[in-house]
Amino acid sequence: MINITAITTEHQLLKNIPIERVEQPDIAWYWVDFYGPEDTETALLRDFFHFHPLAIEDCFQHMQRPKLDHYDGYRFYVIHALNKETLETEEVDIFQGEKFVVTFHLHETPGIAKVRERLYASPDILKKGPGHISYMIMDQLVDEYFPLVYKIEDRLNEIEESRPHKTYGTLMNEVFDLRTDLLHLRRTIIPMRDLLYRILSLDHVKEQRETKAYFSDIYDHLLKLSEIVESNRDMTSDLRDSYVTLNSNRMNAIMMTLTIVSTIFIPLTFIAGVYGMNFDFMPELHWKYGYFAVLGLMAALVIGMLIWFVHKGWFNIFK
C-alpha cells in the first residue's frame, strides 16, 4: 500500500495522489509512505526514486540497528517502533531529501498513521518542510515507548506489593518475565538514543537552532526512558536477590529445625537402643524405678540440650 501526501507551492495540501503527480512543478515537496508494499510498489524505490541499492536492501533486512546514512541528495534513517502487544521491535525506514520524505515499513505502524492525521488536522505543519516530518515520525514513535515502559513499571510495583501473598516460584517467574521485557525495551531505546546523539552532532542541525531544539527534545525523552529502564532492571535484580535470600533463610530455618530435632533424638535413641537389647542380665531391667529413671534421664537430656541451644543462639534464626 502507498499513501502519498504533498503540498503545493501555494501551500495547498494534496492527499492520496498518484505517484506521477509529485513530479509536477507545482509540488513544493511530498511524503510517500510505503506500508506492507507489494513487489510492484517496492520497485518504485529503485525505478522511480533511484535510491541506493544498499539502502533498499536495508529496508528488507529485519532488523537493522537504528542508524543514519548519507547518500547523494538524501539521508537514510533506520528507526525502531515498538509493538505495544508483544514489545517486539518493528523497523521504520526514512529517506529524507530536500523535497521529499519516503517512509517504508513492512508492518502496520500506528505512529505513522497518527503523524499523518496530525498533518491533515494542521496543514500548516507542512510548511516546515520534509525535515520536520522526519522529526515528527521519530518523536511519535519515541513517545509511544512511554506507555510501555510505565506499564512494566506498574507491573513491577504490583509484584513488590503482592510479594507476601505469592509463592516463591510464582514471584520469580514474574520477575524474570519482566526482566525479559525490560531487555527488549533496552535493546530498542539505547540504539535510538545513540542515533539521536549522532543526529544532534550533524553540522546542519547544530546551525539551525529550531531543528536542534526539536531533536534535543527527542534525545531528552530517550535519556529519560533509558534511565527508567535501567532503574527498573536494578529493581528486578534487587527483588530477585531478596527472593533468593528469603528462600535461603527459609531453607536454613528448615535445616536448623531438622538439626535440632535430630540432635535431641540421637541420645534418646541411643538410650532406648541400649535398654531395648534382649540381654537377660541387665540390672536396670528389674529395678522397680528403672522405667521412670530412664524417662527422667531422657527428659533431663532434652531440657539440657534445649538450654544449650538457646545459649548458643540456635533459635535466633527463627526470629
UniProtKB/Swiss-Prot annotation:
Keyword Transmembrane in annotation: yes
Gene Ontology molecular functions: cobalt ion binding; cobalt ion transmembrane transporter activity; magnesium ion binding; magnesium ion transmembrane transporter activity
InterPro entries linked to this entry: CorA_cytoplasmic_dom, CorA_TM1_TM2, Mg/Co-transport_prot_CorA, MgTranspt_CorA/ZnTranspt_ZntB
Record localization: Cell membrane
Transmembrane segments: 254-274, 290-310
Family matches, as Pfam families: CorA (PF01544)
Keywords in alphabetical order: Cell membrane, Membrane, Transmembrane, Transmembrane helix, Transport
GO cellular-component term (any): plasma membrane
Superkingdom assignment: Bacteria
Main location: membrane
Stored CDD domains: TmCorA-like_u2 (cd12831)
Keyword flag Lipid metabolism: no
Coiled coil start-end: none
Bilayer topology term: Multi-pass membrane protein
Record-linked NCBIfam families: corA (TIGR00383)
Family from the record: Belongs to the CorA metal ion transporter (MIT) (TC 1.A.35) family.
Entry protein name: Putative metal ion transporter YfjQ
The organism of origin for this protein: Bacillus subtilis (strain 168)
